[in-house]
């Protein structure tokens, strides 16, 4: 069974095309015109073992907000499409990732109900020209469009780059876990029979 999706989003603010293979090898080709986001998406693909291609153009002359948020929307939609009815998947995933002085933990439930818990203190407002508050916008958009519970907690950390990198890596690993097929699971992992 192929667990792939291609999603396009065209608005007056952005044009995005994203292709995703959940059962990939961690290969990425990302060009968003937002260098820090490119870096985060590349490592997201690598650590989740997803094949990911993203091509995005946006109104970055204003700021990165629309581009970052819309990529979160499209990635959430692609994950949701690729998972189909979620038959046989584990549903839950959790990962803790250290990066030097930082420790981030992410828990995921592919429940069909969107909720983001974001307990991340960022000691700076920018990494280069990237507004770090946009990370939350990305995670919220992904959460809403994947329709998942995602809890992101940073226990400690001082370097804002390390903090966000650990969050993206932990999310990737938690999603990899949650999306894995388990041969013991018949149908979906719910007593309701539907996710």
From Swiss-Prot:
Stated name of the protein: Imidazoleglycerol-phosphate dehydratase
Pathway field: Amino-acid biosynthesis; L-histidine biosynthesis; L-histidine from 5-phospho-alpha-D-ribose 1-diphosphate: step 6/9
Enzyme class name: lyase
A UniProt-annotated Pfam family: IGPD
HAMAP family for the chain: HisB
Record keywords: Amino-acid biosynthesis, Cytoplasm, Histidine biosynthesis, Lyase
Gene Ontology CC terms, in alphabetical order: cytoplasm
Catalytic activity field: D-erythro-1-(imidazol-4-yl)glycerol 3-phosphate = 3-(imidazol-4-yl)-2-oxopropyl phosphate + H2O
Alphabetical list of InterPro entries matching this protein: IGPD_sf (IPR038494), ImidazoleglycerolP_deHydtase (IPR000807), ImidazoleglycerP_deHydtase_CS (IPR020565), Ribosomal_Su5_D2-typ_SF (IPR020568)
Gene name per UniProt: hisB
EC code: 4.2.1.19
NCBIfam families in the record: PRK00951.2-1, PRK00951.2-4, PRK00951.2-5
One GO term (biological process): L-histidine biosynthetic process
Gene Ontology molecular functions: imidazoleglycerol-phosphate dehydratase activity
Subcellular location(s) per record: Cytoplasm
Family of this protein: Belongs to the imidazoleglycerol-phosphate dehydratase family.
Classification via Gene3D superfamilies: Imidazole glycerol phosphate dehydratase, domain 1 (3.30.230.40)
């Amino acid at each position: 069974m192929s667990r792939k999706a291609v999603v396009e989003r065209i608005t007056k603010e952005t044009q995005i095309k994203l292709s995703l293979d959940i059962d990939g090898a961690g290969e990425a080709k990302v060009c968003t015109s937002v260098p820090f986001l490119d870096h985060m998406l590349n490592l997201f693909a690598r650590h989740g073992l997803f094949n990911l291609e993203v091509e995005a153009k946006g109104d970055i002359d204003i700021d990165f907000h629309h581009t970052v948020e819309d990529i979160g929307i499209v990635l959430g939609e692609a994950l949701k499409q690729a998972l189909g009815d979620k038959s046989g998947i584990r549903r839950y995933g959790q990962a803790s990732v250290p990066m030097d002085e930082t420790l981030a933990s992410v828990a995921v439930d592919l429940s069909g109900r969107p909720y983001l818990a974001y307990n991340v203190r960022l000691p700076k407002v920018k990494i280069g020209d990237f507004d770090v508050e946009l990370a939350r916008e990305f995670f919220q958009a992904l959460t809403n469009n994947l329709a998942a519970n995602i809890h992101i907690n940073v226990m400690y950390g001082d370097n804002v780059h390390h903090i966000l990198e650990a969050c993206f890596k932990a999310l990737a690993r938690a999603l990899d876990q949650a999306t894995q097929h388990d041969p013991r699971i018949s149908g979906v992992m719910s007593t309701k029979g539907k996710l």
